Amino acid sequence: MSNYSVSLVGPAPWGFRLQGGKDFNMPLTISSLKDGGKASQAHVRIGDVVLSIDGISAQGMTHLEAQNKIKACTGSLNMTLQRASAAAKSEPVSVQKGEPKEVVKPVPITSPAVSKVTSTTNMAYNKAPRPFGSVSSPKVTSIPSPSSAFTPAHAATSSHASPTPVAAATPLHLSASGLHVSANLSADQCSSPPNTGKPAVNVPRQPTVTSVCSESAQELAEGQRRGSQGDIKQQNGPPRKHIVERNTEFYHIPTHSDASKKRLIEDTEDWRPRTGTTQSRSFRILAQITGTEHLTESENDNTKKANSTQEPSQQPASSGASPLSASEGPESPGSSRPSVAGLRSAAAFKPVGSTSVKSPSWQRPNQAAPSTGRISNNARSSGTGASVGPPQPSDQDTLVQRAEHIPAGKRTPMCAHCNQVIRGPFLVALGKSWHPEEFNCAHCKNTMAYIGFVEEKGALYCELCYEKFFAPECGRCQRKILGEVINALKQTWHVSCFVCVACGKPIRNNVFHLEDGEPYCETDYYALFGTICRGCEFPIEAGDMFLEALGYTWHDTCFVCSVCCESLEGQTFFSKKDKPLCKKHAHSVNF
């Protein structure tokens, strides 16, 4: 941003006009300049945004506050501004670098030359599962999806014919616990973009004999070879119908209808994004063949336990977290290894500036905090214990309150937050009882057990959040007001800041008068500038009828005879020792 500072030598006028402010929901900007004025000579331009006035940020100022702040600068005016050209530029939109969703459309089959890749003999790769069947349609299309449940035929071939066996197909490993998939595919990432750089190639499969291949896996591979052979080559094989399950023996009933259309409808169900760890049909068949279908229940339980102890913030990758790779997700069916996705998901989705683990901050300092595993979205962390609260505000009429700690055993109240019975020590605030761990700020979620809080609009906020978002600013000291607020002259004031100029006492809610823009209490104003009635010794206020006689000023109703109290307004009167008398008592009364 192109920020610059200007210093205009006083006195006013400064040669510019302002527009905007917090009350107009727009930043303070320069609306017009006077030709040859001080602002114009300092190279200030129309449209420049005012960032600070005399060292005080103008971001939260209203239009009137900014005007008063500029008026208060008599000697010199220092401002920090931002050029209009830099302020008008929109910030670049951050594009999420996630994996785009796959567009399902038919792809014609081509057969280019395939480069051979040598592989070591100790690789435990097996063919990916695919349905049984035969060719039935003259025109077939393929739906390439390397990470889907139905792996393409060219990606599941043996190591002698696959150019990229690791990236194109999901390898299967045979271990002591059975057949499982090595890559943990996330449920939301089952659809990955097709590899358009390498067209699908259907190569007739050759039987692969390894030391770890079981008889069931060989039968599955044999069925896959039968399904991949036909008059016309296709990638995902012919359409399939129902699968009858009888003691792990499967009978496939092929159909000879519109295979291309029905294949597109049925097969897309397997690689559509799912929630949780739902298995596709091919994986369920494979799990029953290898005898690992019962391992899924224990895996789901472990995954749920791992996920229940963590609450990652569901924010996009543009907030600072790197996009998840294919290995970060729920464990694939048939695997006996514990999934690491539940342990890594919180770190992968953690936004910038968030803390890792937040311990219960309602505990006293130097006390061991139990491990909870809750993820805090707040930038402030209480560490191992609650930090010592700020000192009590100096305002006597402060709005900040503190909760009262009640030990356990006296009574069992109901918590105002969760409406549950409290067993153990609790807090009392605003006439209600709270669990210590649930008495938190409504904004930052920090505990308020040992710090002050303020009630605002039915919610409870800590001192810091209330000062930041709700507390008004004093018109004299420019500080936040946490106590009693005085509203006068279209501004807010501390009680100790809105005082009489003459006596220095707080005016509070009493009557005051302005003289040359300065407030005076009623007593000092009339003593310095007002007129006192000679008769009642009360001030003659604006609008009162008065008259002047005997060198003094009187209310029209106070200028009466000192003996009979008859009004002497407009009548002949006499005076003895500066006391007015009527004709009747002028010669009969001696003072």
Swiss-Prot record:
Domain PDZ per the UniProt entry, residue ranges: 2-85
Cross-link (Glycyl lysine isopeptide (Lys-Gly) (interchain with G-Cter in SUMO2)): K89
Location of region: Disordered: 121-166, 186-398
Keyword Iron belongs to the record: no
Alphabetized UniProt keyword annotations: Acetylation, Cell projection, Cytoplasm, Isopeptide bond, LIM domain, Metal-binding, Phosphoprotein, Repeat, Synapse, Ubl conjugation, Zinc
Keyword rRNA-binding carried by entry: no
Localization of this protein: Postsynaptic density; Presynapse; Postsynapse; Cytoplasm, Cytosol
Modification N6-succinyllysine occurs at: K89
Residue(s) carrying N6-acetyllysine: K89, K350
Chain positions with Phosphoserine modification: S2, S111, S134, S137, S228, S260, S313, S322, S359, S361
Stretches with biased composition (Low complexity): 144-166, 310-339
SMART domains, sorted: LIM, PDZ
UniProt domain LIM zinc-binding: residue ranges: 413-472, 472-531, 531-591
An example Gene Ontology molecular-function term: metal ion binding
Residues recorded as bearing N-acetylserine in the entry: S2
Record's compositionally biased regions (Polar residues): 134-143, 186-195, 205-217, 353-385
Basic and acidic residues bias (residue ranges): 258-273, 294-304
Record-level GO cellular component terms: cell projection; cytosol; postsynaptic density; presynapse; Z disc
UniProt GO BP: regulation of dendritic spine morphogenesis; regulation of synapse assembly
Subunit-structure text: Interacts with various PKC isoforms through the LIM domains. Interacts with actin and alpha-actinin through the PDZ domain. Interacts (via LIM domains) with SIPA1L1/SPAR; this interaction may occur preferentially with isoform 1.
Function: May play an important role in the heart development by scaffolding PKC to the Z-disk region. May play a role in the regulation of cardiomyocyte expansion. Isoforms lacking the LIM domains may negatively modulate the scaffolding activity of isoform 1. Overexpression promotes the development of heart hypertrophy. Contributes to the regulation of dendritic spine morphogenesis in neurons. May be required to restrain postsynaptic growth of excitatory synapses. Isoform 1, but not isoform 2, expression favors spine thinning and elongation.
Protein name according to UniProt: PDZ and LIM domain protein 5
UniProt source species: Mus musculus
Name of the gene: Pdlim5
